[in-house]
Amino acid sequence: LDSVKAAKIISQLKEQEALKILTGLSKKQLAEILAKMTPEQAASYTEKIAASQE
């Protein structure tokens, strides 16, 4: 699954489901997928992922 398709699919999931998937990815995969999302979505997920790792 390429990052464009993954970003589209993840964007359509409920937030908690999306976060479970995103936090399980490698940093490289995560960066590639976030880069394909809207800036707003990427920022939101990045903030929530960072908060969950504190």
Segments (PLM) and residue ranges:
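Hydrophobic packing positions in regular secondary-structure scaffolds
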Residues: 1-54
